[in-house]
């Protein structure tokens, strides 16, 4: 997904369209609110988000999902050809099950592929069946397990998706607003 790309997903009846586009620094207040609500024990700090955004577009790319102008999800990818790694993906509780996670993940897959990655890795808590189901439905396969990665009794599953050869000649995203 280049800086000029915007993905739109039609809304369910009575809802608002979902728009996925570049995460900007001015989105961070909403992102940090979501981060704290969704990951209270391991939330990224403002400094961690700023550090990640400072690496856009060289090796990182972050997107936000919006409904009605409000951030309802965000995701990021780290690309070092020939591999890429999902750094984070999060969807507001009220927006889960509405295709938001799928739209965010699709944007990361497109970005990784456009930058020449051949495989996309991620880790997911083993006790998150909805997330695991999403990843499997998009072709990710379990490669391994990290015991107690998220704390005692909370394992991480390591997953990967083989990417078809993409164009590494895709336009590089601009740094405006990073």
Region roles according to the model:
Residues 30, 133-134:
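Well-formed, non-transmembrane alpha-helical positions, independent of function
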Residues 121-123, 136, 141-158:
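Conserved catalytic-core motifs of GNAT/GCN5-like acyltransferases
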Residues 39, 49, 74, 134, ...:
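Conserved hydrophobic/aromatic "anchor" residues
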Residues 105, 128-131, 148-153:
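Short glycine/proline-centered loop/turn elements that form peptide/ligand docking sites
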Residues 98:
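Flexible nucleotide-binding loop
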Residues 3-6, 15-18, 22-94, 102-111, ...:
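Acetyl-CoA-dependent GNAT
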């Amino acid at each position: 997904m280049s800086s000029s790309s915007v993905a739109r997903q039609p809304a369910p009846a009575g809802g608002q369209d979902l728009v996925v586009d570049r995460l900007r620094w001015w989105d961070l207040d909403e992102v940090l609110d979501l981060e704290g609500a969704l990951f209270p024990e391991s939330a990224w700090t403002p400094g961690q988000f700023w550090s990640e955004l400072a690496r856009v577009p060289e090796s990182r790319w972050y997107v936000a999902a919006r409904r009605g102008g409000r951030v309802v999800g965000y995701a990021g990818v780290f690309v070092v050809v020939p591999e890429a790694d999902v750094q984070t993906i999060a969807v507001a509780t009220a927006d889960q099950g509405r295709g938001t996670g799928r739209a965010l993940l699709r944007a990361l897959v497109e970005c990784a592929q456009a930058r020449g990655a051949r495989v996309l890795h991620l880790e997911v808590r083993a006790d998150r069946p909805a997330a695991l189901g999403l990843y499997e439905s998009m072709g990710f396969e379990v490669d391994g397990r990290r015991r107690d990665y998220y704390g005692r009794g909370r394992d991480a599953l390591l997953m990967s998706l083989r990417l078809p050869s993409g164009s590494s000649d895709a336009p590089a995203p601009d740094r405006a607003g990073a």
